[in-house]
Amino acid sequence: MPRHHAGGEEGGAAGLWVRSGAAAAAGAGGGRPGSGMKDVESGRGRVLLNSAAARGDGLLLLGTRAAALGGGGGGLRESRRGKQGARMSLLGKPLSYTSSQSCRRNVKYRRVQNYLYNVLERPRGWAFVYHAFVFLLVFGCLILSVFSTIPEHTKLASSCLLILEFVMIVVFGLEFIIRIWSAGCCCRYRGWQGRLRFARKPFCVIDTIVLIASIAVVSAKTQGNIFATSALRSLRFLQILRMVRMDRRGGTWKLLGSVVYAHSKELITAWYIGFLVLIFSSFLVYLVEKDANKEFSTYADALWWGTITLTTIGYGDKTPLTWLGRLLSAGFALLGISFFALPAGILGSGFALKVQEQHRQKHFEKRRNPAANLIQCVWRSYAADEKSVSIATWKPHLKALHTCSPTKKEQGEASSSQKLSFKERVRMASPRGQSIKSRQASVGDRRSPSTDITAEGSPTKVQKSWSFNDRTRFRPSLRLKSSQPKPVIDADTALGIDDVYDEKGCQCDVSVEDLTPPLKTVIRAIRIMKFHVAKRKFKETLRPYDVKDVIEQYSAGHLDMLCRIKSLQTRVDQILGKGQMTSDKKSREKITAEHETTDDPSMLARVVKVEKQVQSIESKLDCLLDIYQQVLRKGSASALTLASFQIPPFECEQTSDYQSPVDSKDLSGSAQNSGCLTRSASANISRGLQFILTPNEFSAQTFYALSPTMHSQATQVPMSQNDGSSVVATNNIANQISAAPKPAAPTTLQIPPPLSAIKHLSRPEPLLSNPTGLQESISDVTTCLVASKESVQFAQSNLTKDRSLRKSFDMGGETLLSVRPMVPKDLGKSLSVQNLIRSTEELNLQFSGSESSGSRGSQDFYPKWRESKLFITDEEVGAEETETDTFDGTPPPAGEAAFSSDSLRTGRSRSSQNICKTGDSTDALSLPHVKLN
């Protein structure tokens, strides 16, 4: 449980403290009001004074700083001079040991124990010298035992063997005792139960048997008992077990067992088949040779022959005599020897592989220390960060700031003179040691005078020292600076609380606060450099051991690279799409999903859409540029036609993600017409667009002609010879435009902007119609449109005149062609000019009137035309459009044309046209919507 290091006026919890033995005795005697408390966590001889002296021994108390300061300073001094007391465990229980047990806790004792255990059980370095000496002793005993069996050397070998056996008994006896004792360094072999567990190990059992046999043989020889010597000669065989104990760690047996276990299946298979061959061959040879050859009289003789033959030993004591037996022996020998020889090859290859693996493992074990060092450096660099709150990480660096307390200098010197070793006392007696003492004395002299005065006058208050070294005396060890004010205590009491007994007898205390920020920065930089050095050393140990390691590294790197490439390809597919498809697959998908829009959010789909839109825009811009250039070049002509501009027809192919709902709708006329003739437009006939411009000064008799003929020609019927004409016509490429008189001056394209207030602009115009030339293949009709915003009142005044002229046209018997304005349901977005659509009010222009009114109207509004837009925009045709008059079958002399300002569309038309006329065939003419935007 961590202690609370933040001090305060009320005194924070100081941690878990347990009453020590010496302090308990003092409390029981009643000598001092305070009782000594032991720091459970630190395990050092730190003594606290607690006011609760009546509490029992071994009780866990939650001590406070205020309670610790309640006792007097005399008891503290006596407790320091006395014995420190028993050590406490982490659970607060006192650890009491006897004098012999406390000796075992000595560091030197543990060091020697570990050293001897490593020499005997884990020999390294010069420890092999001792084991080589023991091996020579054992091998010498073996040689002398051999010579003792030879009659010529029996006497000399026996005397030498007796001396050598005495030496062996002494060496083996001492070694066995040391082994049992040094095994206590391992936690599992501590105590008498642990020692018995260690003595039951196989090699310890062998040592015990050899030692007992050697003692028995030597004791029998020294007594001269002949019968005992002859009876104990068999014990000499047990002395051969000394050779077995040479491999104390059993590495050889472990290696053999691992090889056999690794190749157990192969060995069992070879031995099983070899045993079957041995049985069958011996039995068949026995059946053949038992009558003719006395050497094979029994089946046991045949098995002996088979074993010697198949193992390729071949003593030759037994051989088959009959030819049938020899043939069987040869056949089974060829078959059986191959299986009997398999285990040798399997074990040989297994040993080779195992040895190579052990060498590689040793090479890999060399990486442990660099790896551990690297981990340690990484953690220290992390713990030394500016934002780190770690305290223990600065502990190794506090030794540089280690200073001694001046107030206890005499006592410290006295105790250190008793506890210092001879080497250290000699060093302190040297001039260098005297300089150290003088520095310590100067440190004590640099104390502030106010400190001594305050300590004598008020035992409960003391000020901080002036020097840097003495400032650490009154701070708790390894304690962070607290924002709360620290209590001011007596100097001796503070020393009793915060000072730590050093092993050399000097009381010293250094705080983390003494490490200034620049010093911490330097430590941090050093740790970072150590980290980089450790990383470089660790990388050096990662070098491949052999070619197999290189291949493994390359294969692992290749697999990692493939995984990374696959992951990268998956991400690229998610961003850009699935790449290009084959042409067949493209065609199939295009047929099945011709009008379906894909919702693929990939980058590839977006790029394709953008490319299609850019291509559409480029084609439109090219068309507009061609029109503009033609207008500039032919501006002086009397009539400029858009058909002569060679406008490329716009395809209805979907080039973007916009669709027009009109693309598949039929615009038909009213059902109230007397007769309708529906003509579906051909999909492969492209429309041409004719734009006939007139001079600036238009004649009074301006008119428009709508004449659908067999060739869909647009004709012009002038009222007089001075009339100019302005015709907007859409027809096929084969259409022709009637010649118009040359204008007086060049003219520009000026179209008045549409007005929402204009509903009907009508002028009386002679309209010629040729119903006999109407063909099913005709896809367009001529549409003429001229409008001006100044002619609103003029058009309304002529509306009554238009109706009066209709009756005169009926009397003349001329054919009247009535064109009804079409009301599209929902034009949507144009396929050809989708980005240039602007909605305007519907403008229906009806032209009627006499020559004078037309001349007067043209003179009124044409000079006031301002710069107009080049394109006629699309308008929504409302239900409140001007009603179209219907006529009977009597052919009137004149006609009236009502045209809607629907969008001029180019490209293949999928809508039907209905032309309504009177006569034998009653047709309805539906004008196609043409967008020029």
From Swiss-Prot:
Compartments where found: Cell membrane
GO CC annotations, alphabetized: clathrin coat; plasma membrane; voltage-gated potassium channel complex
SUPFAM superfamilies referenced in this protein's UniProt entry, alphabetically: Voltage-gated potassium channels
Organism: Mus musculus (Mouse)
Residues where a 1,2-diacyl-sn-glycero-3-phospho-(1D-myo-inositol-4,5-bisphosphate) binds: 249, 265, 362
Alphabetized Gene3D superfamilies for the sequence: 1.10.287.70, 6.10.140.1910
Keyword Cell inner membrane: no
Record-given protein name: Potassium voltage-gated channel subfamily KQT member 5
Keyword annotations from UniProtKB, A to Z: Cell membrane, Ion channel, Ion transport, Membrane, Phosphoprotein, Potassium, Potassium channel, Potassium transport, Transmembrane, Transmembrane helix, Transport, Voltage-gated channel
Database matches in InterPro entries: Ion_trans_dom, K_chnl_volt-dep_KCNQ, K_chnl_volt-dep_KCNQ_C
Gene: Kcnq5
GO terms under biological process: potassium ion transport
